[in-house]
A protein has these predicted regions:
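A short alpha-helical cap/connector motif
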Residues: 1-195, 205-263
């Protein structure tokens, strides 16, 4: 019953999002228009996609049981502390569409440093690291056995730029911030944000608490531009942006009557 309630809530939230969402043709920010054009609207297949999805397919068939230590706000799928790898791959890894978006976002912004809180099996990490092989990438995972698997995956995918820190965010985040110095828990990271930083927040509509947290982050005075893509949210700190703006964005193919033909 709880799972059905969650699904129904997400469907309702998506309908609300869909009603509000603008395509790129309704955006007033030139920067955001270009970003959407080269990330949300881009349909090209890059070399890394098939390799990473090949790994995902292997994980979806992996019956190995591992012990899960969940230090986060709670797993999306409740159950025993022993989980099969295929269950983790199905329920905690980013979708192929989100992975491709993250790759394009990193490819567009060209960061020199990246920090990820929550590695899981490393699918999200792999998409981002593959788009910026010269960037320094630190990812933190609280579950030791999951972290060990993710490290194996980074080695298989030849991603030497990824440094995985195994431990809780409380333990490892200060260490990561000291190592990164200038960064490409919101308040802790905020002091390291600069004009070119992008914060990517996952699952912003998953629960009322996460929606409230997302709204609070959008309202923060240091955030100059925010974008709701439903599955994730983007926060920017562009000093050249004089007025604070927020946009709810959807691919133009999903709202064909908002493609600019009748403007």
């Amino acid at each position: 019953m709880k799972r059905i309630t969650i699904i129904l809530r997400l469907v309702w939230k998506y309908l609300q999002y869909y009603w509000r969402a603008e395509t790129r043709y309704g955006l007033h920010s030139p920067f955001l228009y270009e970003l959407v054009e080269k990330t949300v609207e881009d349909t090209r297949n890059f070399y890394a996609f098939s390799i990473i999805e090949g790994l995902r397919n292997l994980l979806l068939r992996d019956d190995t049981q591992i012990t899960i230590a969940d230090h986060g706000a709670g797993s999306k799928v409740t159950g025993s502390s022993r989980r099969a790898v295929h269950s983790l791959a199905r329920h905690t890894a980013v979708s192929p569409a989100t992975g491709r978006f993250l790759f394009r976002l990193v490819h567009f912004t060209k960061p020199t440093t990246l920090l990820e809180l929550g590695t899981s099996l490393g699918i999200s990490t792999a998409y981002q690291a593959a788009a910026a092989r010269k960037a320094r990438f630190i990812t933190i995972e609280g579950c030791p056995e999951t972290a060990a698997l993710a490290q194996q995956h980074f080695e298989q995918l030849n991603l030497p730029n990824v440094q995985l820190l195994a431990g809780t965010f409380q333990e490892k985040l200060p260490e990561a911030l000291r190592k990164l110095k200038r960064l490409d828990y919101f308040e802790q990271c905020l002091q390291f944000a600069h004009s070119g930083s992008v914060f990517v927040i996952a699952d912003i509509h998953w629960s009322a608490e996460m929606e409230n947290a997302w709204r609070e982050m959008c309202r923060h005075p240091k955030v100059s531009l925010s974008a709701d893509l439903f599955h994730i949210g983007l926060l920017f700190f562009r000093k050249e942006q004089r007025e604070k703006e927020h946009f709810t964005i959807i691919r133009s193919v999903l709202k064909p009557w908002r493609m600019g033909f009748f403007d």
